[in-house]
C-alpha cells in the first residue's frame, strides 16, 4: 500500500508540475511533500530544489492530512485500523500521525510505521523520477 501510494503521489506531483509549466526546481521542491521535513529537505537539496518551498509544502500537506483524515476515513468507510493508520502516515507524516494516535493505538502505530517506510520509498523513487 505504501509503495503504491508513494509512486502515485510523486508521479501525480510530477505530472501536475509539468501540466502547469513549473520549472524543474519547483517540481523537485514539491515532489517530497508527503514525508517528514528532514527527509523532504534532503531529497530537495540533493536534486536542486528550493528548501523553503519544500518545507512549506510538507507542513501544508501534514496539516491538511490531519484535518481531513478522519472525515475521509469515514467517507470511504475504512473500518480496518491498520489501513487507516497506514493511509494517514503515508499521506500526512508526523502531523497526521498525531491525529492517528487520537483515533486509536493501532492507527497510531501503523501511521508511525508508514512514515518510515514511505521515507525510504521517497528517497528511492525520487532518484528514479528525477533522473
Residue ranges: model-predicted function:
Residues 26-55, 59-60, 79-117:
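Alpha-helical membrane segments and immediately flanking helix-loop junctions
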Residues 1-5:
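Short, small-residue-biased leader/transition segments that mark boundaries at the very start
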Residues 20-22, 48, 77, 130:
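Short helix-capping/hinge motifs at transmembrane helix termini and TM-loop junctions
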Residues 6-18, 37-41, 62-74, 94, ...:
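Transmembrane alpha-helical segments of multi-pass membrane transport proteins and ion-pumping complexes
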Residues 16-22, 30:
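Short, exposed beta-strand "edge-strand" segments with a Pro/Gly-rich flavor and a Y/T-containing core
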Amino acid at each position: 500500500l505504501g509503495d503504491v501510494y508513494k509512486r502515485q503521489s510523486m508521479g501525480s506531483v510530477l505530472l501536475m508540475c509539468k501540466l502547469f509549466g513549473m520549472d524543474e526546481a519547483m517540481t523537485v521542491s514539491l515532489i517530497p511533500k508527503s514525508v517528514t521535513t528532514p527527509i523532504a529537505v534532503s531529497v530537495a537539496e540533493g536534486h536542486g530544489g528550493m528548501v523553503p518551498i519544500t518545507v512549506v509544502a510538507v507542513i501544508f500537506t501534514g496539516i491538511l492530512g490531519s484535518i481531513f483524515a478522519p472525515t475521509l476515513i469515514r467517507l470511504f468507510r475504512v473500518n480496518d485500523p491498520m489501513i487507516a493508520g497506514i493511509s494517514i502516515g503515508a499521506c500526512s507524516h508526523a502531523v497526521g500521525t498525531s491525529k492517528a494516535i487520537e483515533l486509536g493505538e493501532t492507527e497510531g502505530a501503523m501511521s508511525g510505521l508508514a512514515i518510515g517506510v514511505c521515507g525510504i520509498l521517497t528517497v528511492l523513487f525520487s532518484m528514479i523520477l528525477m533522473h
